[in-house]
Amino acid sequence: MDTFTSAVKINWFPGHMKKTHDQLKKLASSLDGVIEVVDARAPTLTQNPEITAYFTNKPKLTLALKADLAQTVANSNILWGTLKQGLQLKRLVIKKLQTLFQAKKNQLKAKGLLVHQFRLAVIGMPNVGKSSLINLLLNKNHLQVANRAGVTKSMSWNQISSEFYLSDTPGVFFKRIDEMAVGYKLVLTNVIKREVVPLEDVGAFAFCYLSKHYPQLLPYEGTDFTEFLHKFAISRKLLQKSNQLNINLACELFVSELINGKYGKLSFELD
């Protein structure tokens, strides 16, 4: 099996992310709580402690989406789900929010306030499913959604029930990544744009990771990444105009299919 190293450093922190950092910091005192959306394949890695620190004393629902692609572990602090659940997921989210805010509602009721409207921010890294979740809760395609990182650019408020208003926020990435393994895993969960990191580095890391933890999920055998890609290209009949094997396309397809869950359920949080 290949051992994988790379000297590449990821630095992806667009201007709108800094703006969102500043917005959330200012809004924190006026918000009643947050829904933190993470990727079920890497629920810890796709949290952003720089953002959640603003809401330390607020009720927080952590929702791990794409659970159908993940090898999940029991964790009572996380609600696991998939957007394919539709109304079932909506009911689970609303029920969980009602439970989280029951104590607050009791306090307000004791003060004679019978109508409660709570303002929540939906936070998370790029492309973890925040806008899609709000669309589901609103029962309509209200917010701009695309399967790539960095689509939502501004904040907007939406009523999802008589009690709760939600604001989607642009996905906010770490200001810095010191461990390249973390960066590659975030590419493989589609949090980081693939263009930010050399594709061959991502593919090589993915091959090494699957070889170590999930060898049964690799679509083809290979003693190293080079042999694996050759077998991949031959099996898929990936040829260039010169009739040579298109190794670059093989790498691209391998990474894309892994991101989209074609090979089976997994976790990207194994050592």
Curated annotation (Swiss-Prot):
One GO cellular component term: cytoplasm
Matching PROSITE patterns: G_CP
InterPro entries: G_CP_dom, GTP-bd, GTP-bd_ortho_bundle_sf, GTP-bd_ribosome_bgen, GTPase_MTG1, P-loop_NTPase
Record CDD domains: YlqF (cd01856)
Molecular function via GO: GTP binding; GTPase activity
Sites where the protein binds GTP: N127, V128, G129, K130, S131, S132, G171
CP-type G domain location: 21-175
Subcellular location: Cytoplasm
Record key words, sorted: Cytoplasm, GTP-binding, Hydrolase, Nucleotide-binding, Ribosome biogenesis
Gene3D superfamilies, sorted: 1.10.1580.10, P-loop containing nucleotide triphosphate hydrolases (3.40.50.300)
UniProt GO BP: ribosome biogenesis; translation
Family, as annotated: Belongs to the TRAFAC class YlqF/YawG GTPase family. MTG1 subfamily.
Described purpose of this protein according to its UniProt entry: Required for a late step of 50S ribosomal subunit assembly. Has GTPase activity. Binds to the 23S rRNA.
PANTHER family listed in its UniProt record: MITOCHONDRIAL RIBOSOME-ASSOCIATED GTPASE 1
NCBIfam families found in the cross-reference section: GTPase_YlqF (TIGR03596)
Protein name according to UniProt: Probable ribosome biogenesis GTPase A
Organism name: Mycoplasma pneumoniae (strain ATCC 29342 / M129 / Subtype 1) (Mycoplasmoides pneumoniae)
